[in-house]
């Protein structure tokens, strides 16, 4: 098992601060994976879209160039009820994150930690970290954050909401408070996991009245389509035009992603999607209740589709047992900035997968 772990660490190092995919584990380590609890998506929504995709004739979508970005933005705008002039469609939310953060390279940035590492990987200069801690369940003190940003003369503030990996949230009212007290600060709100919280808490449409606000959304998580690479940003048209003129983004979305955008707007699909979403959210409640019975591990409440667990010991042994003994792939968090090396993240999956994860963790829990 030690040899396998060393090979995994090598593979992990090649992936930077992100996790190797299941494909990489299977192909490079020849590891059987029965449960991918690292992957963050709604499996029921994935199954739903696949059923629609199988009925489509995809030949032309593969053969010909897809429409350009602004055309796809108009298709998306009808589905999400956002003015297309304020939209950029990205090759995954990650493309939007990278391009937007590059526009702020010379700015004084505040990153709330622990959080998604790409925000501080792209540009390591001029970053001021605002740390949350486990004693406060990683909840954000908005008043202290505002004071911090004012004192440090912050020009760009990044808020991942719900946050990854902690699953904590900042309410819409608190976000508006931040906007009010930091009127000259560019604020990036990453809502990649908002669909697992409450879509009414989204600040997408606040962009209309706040030119300094940028909202980033992923379609991969909630719809289970990570392989299609599809996300978007809502921002002031001047910002999007600046990015278009600098980076192009002419054909950055593929034909299969176009099919999804077209399918997304179908009334029947929307009806079935809501049922898939409700089923998944109900399963998350059950999974959290299961995890909360672990006596020697602390499970943190989450408003996303994952949970972080403090195992109270170096996480390597726990991770290795799950992966190499139980064929369960989880997210080891010992590389997360300002997070102790005792934390593990598990994703909510199907009922069957959740039960496998819980049963394996119970075995570990008894040994702690």
Residue ranges and their predicted role:
Residues 1-64, 78, 152-153:
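N-terminal "arm"/small-domain region of PLP-dependent enzymes with the aminotransferase-like
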Residues 77-99:
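Short loop-beta-helix segment that forms the pyridoxal 5′-phosphate
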Residues 95, 102-159:
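PLP-dependent aminotransferase-like
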Residues 137-197, 308:
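Active-site phosphate-binding strand-loop segment of PLP-dependent enzymes
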Residues 280-281, 294-326:
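Conserved PLP-binding catalytic core of the aspartate aminotransferase-like
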């Amino acid at each position: 098992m030690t040899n396998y772990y060393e090979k995994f660490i090598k593979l992990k190092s090649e992936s930077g601060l992100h996790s190797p995919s299941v494909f990489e584990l299977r192909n490079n380590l020849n590891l059987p994976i029965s449960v991918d609890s690292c992957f963050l998506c709604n499996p029921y929504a994935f199954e739903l879209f696949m059923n629609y995709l199988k009925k489509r004739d995809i030949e032309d979508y593969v053969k010909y160039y897809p429409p350009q970005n602004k055309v796809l933005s108009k298709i998306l705008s009808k589905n999400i009820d956002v003015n297309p002039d304020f939209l950029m469609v990205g090759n995954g939310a990650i493309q939007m994150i990278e391009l937007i953060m590059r526009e702020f390279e010379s700015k004084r940035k505040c990153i709330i930690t622990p959080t998604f590492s790409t925000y501080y990987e792209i540009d390591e200069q001029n970053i001021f970290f605002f740390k949350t801690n486990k004693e406060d369940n990683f909840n954000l003190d908005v008043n202290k954050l505002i004071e911090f940003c004012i004192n440090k003369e912050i020009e760009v503030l990044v808020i991942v909401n719900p946050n990854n990996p902690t699953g904590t949230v900042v309410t819409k009212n608190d976000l508006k408070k931040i906007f009010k007290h930091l009127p000259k600060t560019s604020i990036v709100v990453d809502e990649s996991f908002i669909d697992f919280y409450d879509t009414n808490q989204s600040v997408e449409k606040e962009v209309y009245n706040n030119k300094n606000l940028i909202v980033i959304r992923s379609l991969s998580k909630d719809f289970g389509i990570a392989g299609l690479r599809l996300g978007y940003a809502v921002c002031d048209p001047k910002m999007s035009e600046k990015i278009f003129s600098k980076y192009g983004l002419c054909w950055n979305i593929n034909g299969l992603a176009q099919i999804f955008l077209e399918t997304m707007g179908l009334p029947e699909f929307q009806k079935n999607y809501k049922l898939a979403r409700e089923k998944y959210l109900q399963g998350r409640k059950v999974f959290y209740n299961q995890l909360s019975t672990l006596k020697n591990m602390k499970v943190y409440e989450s408003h996303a589709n994952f949970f972080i667990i403090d195992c109270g010991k170096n996480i390597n042994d726990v991770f290795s047992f799950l992966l190499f003994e139980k064929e369960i792939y989880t997210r080891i968090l010992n590389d997360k900035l300002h997070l102790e090396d005792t934390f593990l993240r598990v994703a909510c999956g199907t009922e069957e997968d959740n039960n496998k994860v819980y049963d394996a963790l119970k075995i570990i829990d008894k040994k702690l």
